């Protein structure tokens, strides 16, 4: 009985966070897909920095050719942890066509305070590229990381840790991948990164 109550509470929490994190259109899609038995991947909610750190590792581990990251300040401790950087480095060195693209809404903090991801990008600039989100597109308050248009971790508010992670949800990953591509094409290589040789 207690387990049933816990399962119900967990499912309700997932649905509520999904609605909050992904918005009503994508949340409706998730509601339908939650009713079906999953054959691939897993989905869970996060609410702490530590859970976000692990989620980033889990999602990027799913990538074999492309990682797209939309962040406000490179989130110190998340995208510059030794474990995360090792996964990225292993991926780009084993796949000549691998590509890591990072959109940063406010890169000043990352450049000013130093960031190991930026340093790695300097060394592997054939594979890793940073761009500064164009000023009129900085209204996007979310943060997300997409692997191969298949897996993603998504937070509606970049300054909060609540979000949802899915290691196999191509339709939703492609939806946010398309938004990422549009912002990417409209943005430019950040001058401060260019001065660093990135």
Regions inferred by a protein language model and the residue ranges of each:
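PLD/PLD-like phosphodiesterase catalytic module centered on the HKD motif
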Residues: 1-68, 73-198
